[in-house]
Amino acid sequence: MIFVMLLRCDFRKLGKLGPRMICIFMGCAITLGIGFFALFPLFANALGGADKTWGATAALYASWAGGSANMAAMEDALPVDSGAYSCALALDTACYSLWIALLLFAVKYAQKWNKACKADTSKLDAVAAAANEEVAKETNVKPNAADWIFLIGLTLVVSAISQYIGVQMNGFFKGVGLSFFDKGTCTTVFVTILGLICAMTPLGKLPAVTEFSSVYLYAVVSLIASTATLIDLLSAPMWVVYGLGIRLVHVVLMFILSKVFHWDLCMDSTASVACIGGSASAPIIATAYDGSFAGIGVLMGVLGAAIGNFLGLGMGALLKLFV
């Protein structure tokens, strides 16, 4: 799934966003990460204990930095408790719905935000035009049965190779004393890098990639969630409080960054939703400001998918310090 998901993450296309939009997105991802890390020791016991929840929390951060596909990928890369993962999924769903509603409500206050931050929107239209042109190239091609069959075969081959390489990498890292890099982590890192490289080849232009990765995602998330019992969800309320605390830290820090770098609310909101919801959700917020901004939202979501696995693994290494 990871490999297919990343085939659409061509960094050459992401260049259409320009450095300013990429910085806004990274600002969102980093401020969310600060919230996760700073609040985790305060909530760890209420969530079920640091030793039981650090993996699921890192997986949730991967989702909030790039989308649900990254969260599913972390299930193989990190030791994720099924009960904690179920609670994290509940939090992901609750915060996603609430966050979309709040950011849509905030549209009418954009002028006040922009005035307070002295926002610079002079180049926004040019970036939007370039992003929309790039997105239009992909939507004009329709997949056929041959594309689906080829992708199924390709993913099976890549899976076999990745499992073998993961074992070899794990043996190497054990030899140099890096215990964090177990077989699952090594496999995830390898297949992520392979996917990003292949995205810049003709494989990245296959028309069935988006649909195929979505099918994989729904299947994997459903299977993972089905392993948890309903009793595990009783701790979900504290997960929701933890998530709201993270969002509060995120908003405060983003406002400070916007004041310093003169970022506008439209792109702040689009980047924030691109982090938590991916390329399917970001255009909703972007087009609430201007219909021509949809392409920016899509490309921001693609950027999140590309880096979400690495950010999730990094957060896992940090949260494990509290165990």
Protein language model features and the residues they cover:
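Hydrophobic transmembrane alpha-helices of secondary-active transporters
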Residues: 1-20, 189-204, 210-235
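Alpha-helical transmembrane segments of multi-pass small-molecule/ion transporters
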Residues: 18-197, 231-240, 244-275, 279-323
